[in-house]
Curated annotation (Swiss-Prot):
It is an enzyme of class 2 (transferase). Catalyzes the acyloin condensation reaction between C atoms 2 and 3 of pyruvate and glyceraldehyde 3-phosphate to yield 1-deoxy-D-xylulose-5-phosphate (DXP). Pathway: Metabolic intermediate biosynthesis; 1-deoxy-D-xylulose 5-phosphate biosynthesis; 1-deoxy-D-xylulose 5-phosphate from D-glyceraldehyde 3-phosphate and pyruvate: step 1/1. Homodimer. Belongs to the transketolase family. DXPS subfamily. Keywords: Isoprene biosynthesis, Magnesium, Metal-binding, Thiamine biosynthesis, Thiamine pyrophosphate, Transferase. Pfam families: DXP_synthase_N (PF13292), Transket_pyr (PF02779), Transketolase_C (PF02780). This is 1-deoxy-D-xylulose-5-phosphate synthase. GO terms for biological process: 1-deoxy-D-xylulose 5-phosphate biosynthetic process; isopentenyl diphosphate biosynthetic process, methylerythritol 4-phosphate pathway; terpenoid biosynthetic process; thiamine biosynthetic process. It catalyses: D-glyceraldehyde 3-phosphate + pyruvate + H(+) = 1-deoxy-D-xylulose 5-phosphate + CO2. Mg(2+) binds at D151, N182.
């Protein structure tokens, strides 16, 4: 348990209104307590860690100066919002983040009135905040709207689309965008000149001159004097920082400012609150600030399991091979014999298992940053020239490049292999990161071949099969580990569109897809039912399905995808096209966005673990229950 006597100031803060009761001179002490509390609480529970440590001062400054929740803060991605949650009535629950029934890992509108926009994917904040600012302007509402976006999220085109729109509007919306630059990707250093410039561009004097000039000379580009003054200011600032881009897009740029210097932050924000039109504040922060180990390993401490802050993360010993590990090994093995192979990732080198490949084949590795649309069309272009690109991407992020998959890859039947990680139920990261829809939205695309492995060995074979197939292919595999079937070192392929009969039985045929083959087989063998590892969602094994339809009374399809339009729907469509009338029971994920919990709990909740499949069968066919087949035997 956390001893709140160690946090005398933080213990007095339940809402931002309580924070505003402190004197400015006390905020440094509040920040120190908040940072230490974050370290202690996340150490107990696990969760996103380093990003939140980097925005402690910024979060305090925003809630201190802005009248939240009337003024609206829109956070991008959400990894950095633990301090925000702590200051907005959720301090005592922060250790429940990512746990079933606990706080969401990202901002969630249903959770708090201070969470103005739900998020989990990157680069949405400016668009959402602009929408809010436009409505406020139309309603004559003086509320302030602030978007907080990291420099990583600024690699996505959507952010620039929003900046371009906001900066070109007339009348101009009152919108503040805060660029949280924690990787020095925009400014290489915060030296003396840039510090001086940050103070100057954020000063009342310069802004008074600028605003006075607008009133005297006008703000139109056709006014020669105003145009000259604007160009002079841009030239002066452009010598020191890359502000010209934002200024050209119609934003008044302030910064860069040290994001851990509370007086500097407060001073700049006080000035910016008085200005009209689109504003951009550039702050420099350190991810993991205040915890030396996190500052030194920002990737390793991005998201953590529970740990002792006094000792830091302890490297795990030998662990069971994950599906991501299988992909990682296959990719390097295939690259060794196939010079055409090129690998692409949208900023997920570690998560998608590309670290080893990037080290062994740096000239064949392409990290395009958070740019899923570009990643897929880049792969399409490579394929037109005879290369075989492999796009390693999470299922949830593939949604962002769906048009490119359809229009640029599938329509042209280009040889692109999609290694779709985190398919199906994902777990603690919640609805924003779930892969519950991919079988549905991939199955309907013409020319697309789609596979889902039942185990690790099959995953490797499917990747090889997809690599050698002529046309677009997706191999969709889950987060975490599988049954433990060790893959061979060979690069064997599977016959396309051929399922695997796992067990011959009577009456009922259980058709399992991907991870659902294991519970289907566990239950089917116990009850004497036929069990099939379908392997292919598209094309389905037509020959086997027609044979089973002639010899069985009913089909039961089992998949970790929403039932609507999923793999089971494909089976029903095939039988319908053949004029076969046969009862089909579809077991899968619900028509709902599942919330955060462990994968095991979510699979059980959906009724597609072994116990759930068993219960579903007995509810429809009670005669299957015999003394030797108790529910507890398969739970």
């Amino acid at each position: 348990m956390i001893d709140f006597t160690c946090y005398p100031r933080l213990s007095r803060i339940q809402t931002p209104e309580d924070l505003r009761a402190f004197q400015e001179s006390e905020l440094r002490a509040v920040a120190d307590e908040l940072r230490n509390y974050l370290i202690e609480s996340v150490g107990l529970s696990g969760g996103h860690f380093a990003a939140g440590l980097g925005v402690v001062e910024l979060t305090i400054a925003l809630h201190y100066l802005y009248c939240t929740p009337i003024d609206q803060l829109v956070w991008d991605v959400g990894h950095q919002t633990y301090p925000h949650k702590i200051l907005t009535g959720r301090r005592d629950k922060i250790s429940t983040v990512k746990h079933q029934g606990g706080l969401a890992p990202f901002p969630k509108r249903e959770e708090s009135i201070y969470d103005t926009f739900g998020v989990g994917h990157s680069s949405t904040s400016i668009s959402a905040a602009l929408g809010m600012a436009i409505v406020a302007q139309r309603n004559g509402d003086e509320r302030k709207v602030v978007a907080i976006i990291g420099d990583g999220a600024m690699t996505a085109g959507m952010a620039y689309e929003a900046l371009n729109h906001a900066g070109g509007m007339s009348p101009a919306p009152n919108l503040l965008v805060i660029l949280n630059d924690n990787r020095m990707s925009i400014s290489e250093a915060v030296g003396g000149l840039t510090k001086m410039l940050g103070r100057a561009t954020g000063s009342k004097a310069l802004n008074a001159i600028r605003e006075g000039g607008k009133r005297i000379f006008g703000d139109k580009k056709t006014n020669a004097t105003a145009r000259f003054l604007r160009r002079w200011e841009e030239h002066w600032k452009g010598m020191f920082v890359p502000s010209t881009l934002f200024e050209e897009m119609g934003f008044h740029y302030t910064g860069p400012i040290d994001g851990h210097d509370l007086p500097a932050l407060l001073g700049a924000l006080k000035t910016l609150r008085t200005l009209k039109g689109p504003q951009l504040l550039h702050v420099i922060t350190t991810k993991g600030k205040g915890y030396e180990l996190a500052e030194g390993d920002q990737i390793g401490y991005h998201a953590v399991a529970p740990f002792d802050p006094q000792k830091g993360l302890i490297k795990a010993g030998a662990k069971k091979q994950t599906y991501t590990d299988v992909f990682s090994e296959w990719l390097c093995d295939m690259a060794a014999v196939e010079p055409r192979l090129l690998a692409i990732t949208p900023a997920m080198r570690e998560g998608s298992g590309l670290v080893r490949f990037s080290q062994e084949y740096p000239q064949r590795y392409f990290d395009v940053a958070i740019a899923e649309q570009h990643a897929i069309t880049l792969a399409a272009g490579m394929a037109t020239q005879g290369a075989k690109p492999v796009v390693a991407i999470y299922s949830t992020f593939l949604q962002r490049g769906y048009d490119q998959l359809v229009h640029d890859v599938a329509l042209q039947k280009l040889d692109v292999l999609f290694a779709v990680d985190r398919g199906g139920v994902v777990g603690p990261d919640g609805a924003t990161h779930a892969g519950n829809l991919d079988l549905s939205f991939l199955r309907c695309v013409p020319n697309m071949m789609l596979m889902a492995p039942a185990d690790e060995a099959e995953c490797r074979k499917m990747l090889s099969t997809g690599f050698h197939y002529s046309g677009p292919v997706a191999v969709r595999y889950p987060r975490g580990t599988g049954p433990g079937v060790v893959p061979s070192a060979e690069l064997d392929v599977l016959p396309v569109g051929v399922a695997q009969l796992r067990h011959s039985g009577t009456r009922i045929a259980l058709l399992g897809f991907g991870v659902c083959v294991a519970p289907a087989e566990q239950v089917g063998r116990r009850l004497g039912l036929t069990v099939v590892n379908m392997r292919f969602i598209k094309p389905l094994d037509r020959t086997l399905l027609l044979e089973l339809a002639r010899t069985h009374e009913v089909f039961v399809t089992i998949e970790d995808n929403v039932v609507a339009g999923g793999a089971g729907s494909g089976v029903a469509e095939l039988l319908n096209a053949e004029g076969i009338v046969l009862p089909i029971v579809h077991l899968g994920l619900p028509d709902a966005f599942q919330q955060h919990a462990s994968r095991e709990d979510l699979l059980a909740e959906a009724g597609i673990d072994a116990a759930g499949v068993y219960a579903a069968l007995l509810s429809r066919w009670p005669d299957l229950a015999v003394q030797n087949h108790p529910l507890s035997a398969v739970s």
